[in-house]
Each structure stands twice: as C-alpha cells, then as structure tokens.
C-alpha cells in the first residue's frame, strides 16, 4: 500500500490508500539496468522501507547513501536506469523521493514507460553487486534492444529540489489508463534519488486467462483493492491481498483491541466468543466473478488472531461503490450475500474453505471480511472464475456451501 503524501498536495485528487507501489522489491520489482551505480546502487530505489541517513557511514567509494547515486559525470550524456514493475498495470502517480540528498540530488529528472510482452524480452545480464561500477558495453548493448529511448513520457523533464523534509517528496499525477510493465527513470545529468514509488493499481490481462484455472480474484497484483475498513491501527487491509505470503506480522492487517469487549468473555455452544463488536474490511475484486475457494491465513498472528470470521459478497456498480465509501459502508443487509458463515479461526494457521457446488454460485464484485472481535490476518485469497465465464452458469441459489479444511503453517 502507498503512504499518503506528506505535503498533502494530491490528497484531493487521489486516494493514496487505494494505490500500491508497483515497483517495490516487496512485490517483485527489479532493476534491469543502470548507467552508473558508483556511490549507491539503483536497487535502493525500490526498497519498501523509507530512506534513512547514517551520518558517519562511509564505503570505500564515498559517503553511504540510502538511494541511487551516480558519480559526478565527466563524459557526455546523462544517467538513467530501467526497472521492471513487480505489479503491472495502470499508473496513477509517481513519488520521486530525494530525502537526505541535499547537496548531491539529481537536479532534473523525467520518467518514461512501456508495455512490453514478457516472452519477447531480450536476455538482460544479471547486475550483481554494483557499488563502484558503471554499466559495461555488453550491458548497454543488451538494454538497447528494449529501445527505451522511444518509450512514452509520463513525466517530462522536471526540476527537483534538495531532499530536505519540506521538499524531499516530489509527486506527479499520471493521466493514462494504459497498462505499463517497465519504467525508465532519467536523471540530468547525474546525482542521487532515494526512492521511486510507482503508485497505481494492478491490471491483469483476463483475455489470456485459462478458463479452466482458478484465479485469485482479489489479488492486488490483478487489481483488487481495499475500498473501506473499520480499523487499521497496525496494518492496512491492502496488505492481506498482497503478493506472495506474508513476511511478518507487519505485512498483514491488524486492528486495535476493541474496548467494547465484555469484562469476562464467554463462548456460545459452538465455541465462538460472545462479543458485541467486530472489525471489517471491504474489497473490490480485480474482476467480477464466482468465488470457489477462500483462504484466510493468520500466520505470524499467534497471540492476536481473531476468534472467528465470516465473508460476504455483493454486486455494486461504480457509482454505488462511491456512495458506499461516502457512507462508510453502511450497506443494507440484503445487499450482502453470505459466502462463508461465521467460522472459528486458529492462530498462526492457514484456513481453507472449498466450495462444493460451483454451478450454484453467484457473481460478486465486492467482498467483505469480518473478524470478531479484533486482531490480525496475514493473507486473504478469494479464488474463482471471472464473470465472463461464470455468468453462463445457473444462479438459482445465493448461498454458497463450503467444506472446511485447515492447513497449519509451520
């Protein structure tokens, strides 16, 4: 998930909580090429954590900096790098972060992009350890096959300011609905940039999807996104639809402890806690479809997993979603259809729920995960078939039937 702009200049145009950093190393972003990495390698641009400064830290090549920093150029040209997005899709904005680069920041930059077919890409040499090095003639020859000079400009050449707290972040809106896979960052003529955040939403090519294979319809890499939640004290719900498995408890969704819990807790006859409150998160699916398998993973949440959960689904238009966001998701009960009834959860465990009868499932556009009374979840997977396939199936019953299985995490 993307952090909100610190200066607040774009908050009236974009809801940054609905965007993800498509270039981050945490989602599979990768630096393919850089003209120079003398002081600090370009891989630092796509680190998921915020840049830091170590006043007394030096390397054999000079001052240690948490970003990409090239040598002072003494030959014709300018520096640039190429990266492959970990999440490919629609770019809404860039954050060019020059934090801590106050006397050696890149004075100007521009950004280009391309939509390339993976199977047609040339072989690019692995970069390895780059500090103190410049690109070799062989690397220049390989990257030239991408013809990145001709890529579309999403940000023209623009001046940057020093990386002081008030001017470190430089935000640029992108007015394009095109799908992008690769980025070229140009700096003029040289210097340093701490981070490049490519903010947007994933976009899967559903026409290329095998209709016989399940797809995770809520995956952030395909375009799924959290559009509402009750609490996100220790982690945003977008984390639980992230790429791959959770890396730690910080990589999940965790709420604050509810204060309306009874002084003494009791269970019902099914072993479910009797409490008045709950927490919830609503997700827009990457593609409308039928859900046939649900996975709820509480890995790493050993003393703070929810007691129970349920999952509901509904069909909403874009306008209805906008209205619900304004109303904080106070949605009439009849709109939600149960996908998974109230179910007991266990700590640090993956819980699998498989549909018994696909033909009886309904198409949904949104899903709501409710946890009781509070706690944390590391991953949510909603696997099924996109609506272009499942709309051809009978839809007699709204209720989905599940068999419950548990797969313990090590």
UniProtKB/Swiss-Prot annotation:
Pfam family, one: Allantoicase
InterPro entries, sorted: Allantoicase (IPR005164), Allantoicase_dom (IPR015908), Galactose-bd-like_sf (IPR008979)
Swiss-Prot/TrEMBL GO biological process terms: allantoin catabolic process
Cystine bridges: none
GO MF terms held by the record: allantoicase activity
Matches recorded under HAMAP family: Allantoicase
Task of the protein: The function of this enzyme is unclear as allantoicase activity is not known to exist in mammals.
Similarity section: Belongs to the allantoicase family.
NCBIfam families for this protein: allantoicase
Name of the featured protein: Probable inactive allantoicase
């Amino acid at each position: 998930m993307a952090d909100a702009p610190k200066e607040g200049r774009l908050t009236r145009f974009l809801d940054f909580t609905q965007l993800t950093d498509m270039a981050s190393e945490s989602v599979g972003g990768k630096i393919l090429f850089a003209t120079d990495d003398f002081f600090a390698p370009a891989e630092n641009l796509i680190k998921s954590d915020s840049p830091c400064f170590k006043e007394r830290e030096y390397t054999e090549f000079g001052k240690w900096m948490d970003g990409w920093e090239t040598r002072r150029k003494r030959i014709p040209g300018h520096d640039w790098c190429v990266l492959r997005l970990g999440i490919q899709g629609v770019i809404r904005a860039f954050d060019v972060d020059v934090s801590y680069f106050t006397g050696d920041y890149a004075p100007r930059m521009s950004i280009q992009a391309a939509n390339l077919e993976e199977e047609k890409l040339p072989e690019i040499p692995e970069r390895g350890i780059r500090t103190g090095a410049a690109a070799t003639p062989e690397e220049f020859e390989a990257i030239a096959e991408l013809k990145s000079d001709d890529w579309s400009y999403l940000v023209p050449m623009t001046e940057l300011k020093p990386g002081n707290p008030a001017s470190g972040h430089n935000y640029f809106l992108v007015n394009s609905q095109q799908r992008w896979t690769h980025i070229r960052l140009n700096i003029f003529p040289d210097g340093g940039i701490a981070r490049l955040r490519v903010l947007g939403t994933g976009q899967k090519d559903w026409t290329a999807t095998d209709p016989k294979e399940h797809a995770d319809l809520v995956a952030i890499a395909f375009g799924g996104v959290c559009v509402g939640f009750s609490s996100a004290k220790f982690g945003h719900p977008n984390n639980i639809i992230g790429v791959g498995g959770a890396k730690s408890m910080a990589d999940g969704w965790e709420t604050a402890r509810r204060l309306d819990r009874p002084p003494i807790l009791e269970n019902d006859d099914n072993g479910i806690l009797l409490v008045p409150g709950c927490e919830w998160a609503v997700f827009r699916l990457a593609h409308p479809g039928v859900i046939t398998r649900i996975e709820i993973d509480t890995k790493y949440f050993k003393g703070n997993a929810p007691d129970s959960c349920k999952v509901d689904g509904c069909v909403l238009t874009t306008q209805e979603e906008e209205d619900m966001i304004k109303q904080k998701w106070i949605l009439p009960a009849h709109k939600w259809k149960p996908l998974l009834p109230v179910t007991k959860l266990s700590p640090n465990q993956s819980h699998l729920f498989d549909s018994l009868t696909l033909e009886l499932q309904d198409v949904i556009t949104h899903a709501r995960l409710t946890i009781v009374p509070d706690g944390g979840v590391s991953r949510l997977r909603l696997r099924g078939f996109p609506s272009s396939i499942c709309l051809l199936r009978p839809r007699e019953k709204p209720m989905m039937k599940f068999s419950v299985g548990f797969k313990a995490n090590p």
